[in-house]
Amino acid sequence: MVLVTGIGRCGTSILMRCLKEIGFYIGANCVWDEKIRAGYELPVASNINFSMCRDYFGKGNPINLDDHIHNHYGKLIDLTYRQAIGMVDEKGFIKVIKDPRFTWYPDIVEAWWSVRQDFKLIICHRDIESVVKSRNMMPKEHSDLKNRGALQYKEDFADFFTKVLQLEIPYETLFFPNFLRNFKSTYNVLEKVGLHFDYDLGKKVWDCLIDRELLKET
């Protein structure tokens, strides 16, 4: 399984959209929001991470994997964090999952790795000042718990990446927007994490999708 993550507004969504159009299964109920040109988070995974953020980090408490998880409405459900993480794609149908919350607190990716070590990371990154500028342009209803300044985002990413290195989690990186115009390099990264597909087919899908997205920015 591949987890795609990044601090936000750094190309994770467009990467997922491309993978979906190539033919990779990214899970049920993963939707694209044209208003912000982003999406494709797997609800079951994002709910686990969102619940961790709400239950622990707002209160300064360490993650207890044997606590019961809350749903998006704050209601306890009959699953512990350990069970819920282990059940994500337990049948192996989903090839790639996206959620930016893995970068928010290093304890989140550590919690997942302590339960299951069957995933690799694709870490999308971007100039932090550009991330903040892009986030500030988003509608208020799409703001998130980590609506912070450049220094805080730099610290978040440093803490996250240090934890990835410490735990020796396999990873590859893509830098936004550079990777949008370098399909060969992007293809090589996807191959390295086990996302195999025909190069020519992928390039055709990629070029068409990237051209459409760039056209919307003009």
Language model features with spans:
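PAPS-dependent sulfotransferase catalytic core
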Residues: M1-R82, K204-K216
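Conserved alpha-helical scaffold flanking the Walker A/P-loop in AAA+ ATPase domains
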Residues: A84-G86
